[in-house]
């Protein structure tokens, strides 16, 4: 796969049972979402609700088809969208978009699911409590397990086009963090007071690594994707009690780049850096496997740094 490109469906309007936008309104919203990297803040949401005369939840479900447009699905051609409704640090409601991402000629287990993408978007951007998640299609078992790692797993609503559930309805008798003796969870991590003993590590990359949720491997790790003209994109490692549904830092960062409507190719990407915790490294192989799906990218820079005691 030479590149992964966000395809804007020009001259189309978003209209469904929840909301109806004109072509111009739809195009403006698409552009806004790319600029804001897949996030609508409280002001954006309130303005749209007033403009369209709809409720907050109607807007949430009505925008899911736009989330699906961010999908990069060269294998299945099946585009899935998800939007997390969550409270930020100020207690205001934001919408965090997500979509699936696939990688040609690599194991299907490397894909990013739409629910993972939306939750990752909320997590990386400071969301504190998930209230609802609206999805274009029923979540697979993998995604149900990923959601089971969340601090609010038993509380938030899962909204499908025609139905509404709690996670316990979809994942009864579940296996989660407490089964492994882990009292913490995604969005409720263990306190972090350590730092990397390497003064050459970029401060922001280190911050994303230290914010990783890694109770099972202790590999605090993050990825930075540097672009030529569109800034930097970061991703953090998010582990899961079932292990397989864990989200790698490269997948985390790539999902953020795709939500900005950017292509992952040599024309966009200037550099890719993976930071891992010395003695706990486990991400280089996965990162190289994902990158093998693409051509003419800069080489992956690997940094292994010890943590302070």
From Swiss-Prot:
Its cofactor is Zn(2+). GO terms for cellular component: cytosol. Zn(2+) binds at residues 113, 140, 143. Residues 55-178, 196-309 form the CMP/dCMP-type deaminase domain. GO terms for biological process: cytidine deamination. The active site is at residue 115. Its EC number is 3.5.4.5. InterPro entries: APOBEC/CMP_deaminase_Zn-bd, CMP_dCMP_dom, Cyd/dCyd_deaminase_Zn-bd, Cyt/Deoxycyt_deaminase, Cytidine_deaminase-like, Cytidine_deaminase_bacteria. Keywords: Hydrolase, Metal-binding, Zinc. The keyword Zinc applies. It catalyses: cytidine + H2O + H(+) = uridine + NH4(+); 2'-deoxycytidine + H2O + H(+) = 2'-deoxyuridine + NH4(+). It is an enzyme of class 3 (hydrolase). Belongs to the cytidine and deoxycytidylate deaminase family. This enzyme scavenges exogenous and endogenous cytidine and 2'-deoxycytidine for UMP synthesis. This is Cytidine deaminase. It comes from Pseudoalteromonas translucida (strain TAC 125). The gene is cdd.
């Amino acid at each position: 796969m030479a590149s992964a490109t966000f395809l804007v469906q020009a001259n189309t309007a978003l209209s469904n049972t929840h909301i109806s936008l004109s072509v111009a309104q739809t195009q403006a919203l698409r552009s806004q979402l790319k600029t804001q990297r897949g996030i609508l803040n409280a002001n954006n949401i309130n303005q749209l609700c007033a403009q369209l005369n709809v409720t907050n939840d109607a807007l949430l479900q009505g925008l899911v088809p736009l989330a699906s447009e961010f999908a990069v699905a060269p294998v299945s051609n099946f585009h899935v969208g998800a939007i997390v409704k969550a409270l930020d640090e100020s207690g205001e409601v934001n919408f965090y978009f997500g979509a699936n991402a696939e990688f040609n000629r690599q194991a299907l287990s490397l894909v990013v699911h739409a629910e993972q993408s939306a939750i990752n978007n909320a997590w990386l951007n400071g969301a504190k409590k998930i209230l609802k998640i609206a999805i274009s299609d029923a979540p697979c078992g993998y995604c149900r397990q990923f959601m089971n790692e969340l601090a609010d797993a038993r509380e938030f609503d899962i909204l499908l086009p025609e139905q509404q559930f709690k996670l316990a309805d979809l994942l009864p008798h579940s296996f989660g963090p407490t089964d492994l003796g882990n009292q913490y969870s995604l969005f409720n991590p263990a306190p972090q007071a350590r730092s990397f003993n390497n003064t050459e590590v970029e401060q922001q990359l280190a911050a994303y690594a230290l914010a990783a949720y890694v109770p099972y491997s202790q590999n605090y790790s993050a990825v930075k994707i540097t672009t030529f003209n569109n800034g930097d994109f970061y991703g953090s490692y998010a582990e899961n009690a079932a292990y397989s549904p864990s989200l790698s830092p490269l997948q985390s960062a790539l999902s953020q780049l795709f939500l900005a409507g950017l292509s992952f190719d040599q024309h966009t990407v200037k550099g890719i850096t993976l930071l891992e915790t010395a003695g706990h490294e486990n991400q280089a192989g996965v990162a190289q496997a994902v990158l093998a799906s693409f051509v003419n990218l800069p080489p992956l820079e690997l940094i292994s740094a010890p943590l302070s005691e």
